Swiss-Prot record:
The gene is rpsM. It comes from Serratia proteamaculans (strain 568). Coiled coil: none annotated. Residues 91-118 are annotated as: Disordered. GO terms for cellular component: cytosol; small ribosomal subunit. This is Small ribosomal subunit protein uS13. Belongs to the universal ribosomal protein uS13 family. GO terms for biological process: translation. Part of the 30S ribosomal subunit. Forms a loose heterodimer with protein S19. Forms two bridges to the 50S subunit in the 70S ribosome. Gene3D superfamilies: 1.10.8.50, 30s ribosomal protein s13, domain 2. Keywords: Ribonucleoprotein, Ribosomal protein, RNA-binding, rRNA-binding, tRNA-binding. It holds the Pfam family Ribosomal_S13. GO terms for molecular function: rRNA binding; structural constituent of ribosome; tRNA binding. Located at the top of the head of the 30S subunit, it contacts several helices of the 16S rRNA. In the 70S ribosome it contacts the 23S rRNA (bridge B1a) and protein L5 of the 50S subunit (bridge B1b), connecting the 2 subunits; these bridges are implicated in subunit movement. Contacts the tRNAs in the A and P-sites. InterPro entries: Rbsml_uS13_C, Ribosomal_uS13, Ribosomal_uS13-like_H2TH, Ribosomal_uS13_bac-type, Ribosomal_uS13_CS.
Length: 118
């Protein structure tokens, strides 16, 4: 297994799909990484040479991924909550942040139904 950005990349998958197992790299960014390094998208990770894997490591290192990205997202949410913005309050209360309705639906964000006590 190749190790890129601290993640074990699955050998049996194609390069484009395998790179998406890194947090912060989706399909589009994965395709652009393959294009910039000159590695074909349909080649499996196990078929790549050590030099090509090193090229992928360098290309991925240019982006904010994994732990740094998770930390950045967490800190930005915490900043919103500390400032007391509307979005921060919605995060704090565990409600939908982006304007979705909450009279019905929003069960994923609100959690399971709570019975009405008589």
């Amino acid at each position: 297994m190749a190790r890129i950005a601290g993640i074990n990349i699955p050998d049996h998958k194609h390069t484009v799909i395998a790179l998406t197992s890194i947090f912060g790299i989706g399909k589009t960014r994965s395709q652009s990484i393959c294009a910039s390094t000159g590695i074909a998208e349909h080649v499996k990770i196990s078929e790549l040479s050590e030099e090509q894997i090193e090229q992928l490591r360098e290309a991925v290192a240019k982006f904010t991924v994994e732990g740094d990205l998770r930390r950045e997202v967490t800190l930005s949410i915490k900043r919103l909550m500390d400032l007391g913005t509307y979005r921060g309050l919605r995060h704090r209360r565990g409600l939908p942040v982006r304007g979705q309705r909450t009279k019905t639906n929003a069960r994923t964000r609100k959690g399971p139904r709570k019975p009405i006590k008589k």
